[in-house]
């Protein structure tokens, strides 16, 4: 199923809306429902969607209950599959191609007034170098018609780029906007090893949609989901430029940094394309980042004790804090679970371990468990000298 197939419940907004703060202001004023803006002043002929990927909407879109999603993602991690390759003539993303690349002509939004400018926050980057492929999320500041500046946190893509630059090489990439939600989930997962996230997406496609994941090859050799709404391709150059400020997942403003410049050589899109214009710091952002962390935390904790469930908390912005439910069998299971959970998601700042009778999605029940069962001097550990998340508002 394509991205657009999951927008049936969206409210269509026909009134003229500016991509400069307009979509953000309208969504905020209406409590962030699922919206499709079809009359964007600066980019006629292009639509934009926001607020699709809340936990409940995402699970409904891919046909599983919220209680099943952790085990479904964990299954895909253990059972990767291979996508199939289709010719560009069969790929919906190739229905239209710009004569010359003009990213300013598509609805990349400037949501928050504090942001540096227009940002693509929901697009995934697929990169290939030295036989390794990586798919991951990285926000991109729209610098001009054919350049963006990409924020690369210290994970696999930055390592790939650093290796390439040491050899004097650029990195071939594609930027994919609005593939189906299964691809987005796989792209949001992170692993210690260089696992091909598209193989995880392919496994999820087969399990949830009963069909293979279709990819098509671009001019630079990078393979991308064939049904995506937008695809643009080029290379991570040897140059850096200013990136930020940017309102991040915590609602705090991230710093200005020197980050890599991407230069684009081609842009294609579907007929009547719909840009995924995620609003940073809101529920969709937190869901997309937080949901894929839960199975990695559960997997890590399950190696030291019996882990039942994991919940990334709303107060922790879906990223910095979690509640983990275990079935305690040994006196030190709780402490071991804390250490394992923090190792399973290294950006996490706080984790709370509770017994199997607690509803971990209910903050009142979690607080009750703490005040009735937690002894701070015995049941608390603090890990010193660890690296903070770059999204930690304190740093």
Which ranges hold each PLM region?
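Substrate-recognition/cap regions that form aromatic- and gly/pro-loop-enriched pockets
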Residues: 314-381
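Flexible loop/turn segments at secondary-structure boundaries
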Residues: 2, 19-21, 43-45, 142-145, ...
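Conserved small/polar residues in nucleotide/adenosyl-binding loops
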Residues: 385-392
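Low-complexity, highly charged intrinsically disordered N-terminal segments
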Residues: 46-84
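C-terminal substrate-recognition/cap domain of FAD-linked oxidoreductases
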Residues: 241, 245-333
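Short, solvent-exposed amphipathic alpha-helical segments in soluble enzyme
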Residues: 54, 139-143, 190-193, 247-252, ...
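An N-terminal JmjN-like helical accessory module and its immediate linker preceding a catalytic domain
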Residues: 1-55, 367
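Conserved mixed alpha/beta core segments that line enzyme active sites in large multi-domain catalysts
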Residues: 6-28, 73-261, 267, 295-300
């Amino acid at each position: 199923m394509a991205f657009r197939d999951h927008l049936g419940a969206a409210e269509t907004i026909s009134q003229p809306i500016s991509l400069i703060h307009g979509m953000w202001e309208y969504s905020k004023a209406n409590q962030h429902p699922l919206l499709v803006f079809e009359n964007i002043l600066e980019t006629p002929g292009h639509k934009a969607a926001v607020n699709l990927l809340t936990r409940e909407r995402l699970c409904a879109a891919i046909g599983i209950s919220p209680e099943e999603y952790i085990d479904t993602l964990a299954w895909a991690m253990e059972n990767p599959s291979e996508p199939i390759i289709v010719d560009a003539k069969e790929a919906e993303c190739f229905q239209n191609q710009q004569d010359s690349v003009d990213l300013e002509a598509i609805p990349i939004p400037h949501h928050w007034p504090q942001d540096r400018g227009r940002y693509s926050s929901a697009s995934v980057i697929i990169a290939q170098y030295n036989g390794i492929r990586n798919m991951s999320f990285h926000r991109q500041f729209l610098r001009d018609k054919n350049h963006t500046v990409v924020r690369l946190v210290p994970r696999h893509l930055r390592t790939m780029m650093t290796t390439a630059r040491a050899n004097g090489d650029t990195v071939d990439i594609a930027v994919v906007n609005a593939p189906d939600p299964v691809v987005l989930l796989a792209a949001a997962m992170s692993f210690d090893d260089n696992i091909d996230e598209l193989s995880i997406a392919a496994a999820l496609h087969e399990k949830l949609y009963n069909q293979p994941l279709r990819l098509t090859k671009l001019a630079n050799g990078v393979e991308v989901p064939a049904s995506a709404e937008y695809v643009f391709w080029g290379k991570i150059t040897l140059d850096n430029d200013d990136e930020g400020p940017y309102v991040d997942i915590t609602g705090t403003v991230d710093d200005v940094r020197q980050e890599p410049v991407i230069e684009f050589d081609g842009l294609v899109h579907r007929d009547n394309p719909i840009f995924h214009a995620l609003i940073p710091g809101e529920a969709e952002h937190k869901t997309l980042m937080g949901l894929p962390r839960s199975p990695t935390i559960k997997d890590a904790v399950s190696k030291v004790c019996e882990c039942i469930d994991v919940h990334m908390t709303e107060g922790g912005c879906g990223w910095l804090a979690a509640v983990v439910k275990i079935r305690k069998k040994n006196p030190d299971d709780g402490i071991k679970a804390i250490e394992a959970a923090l190792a399973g998601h290294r950006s996490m700042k706080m984790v709370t371990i509770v017994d199997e009778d607690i509803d971990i999605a209910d903050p009142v029940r979690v607080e009750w468990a703490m005040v009735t069962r937690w002894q701070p001097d015995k049941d608390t550990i603090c890990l010193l000298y660890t690296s903070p998340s770059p999204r930690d508002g304190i740093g």
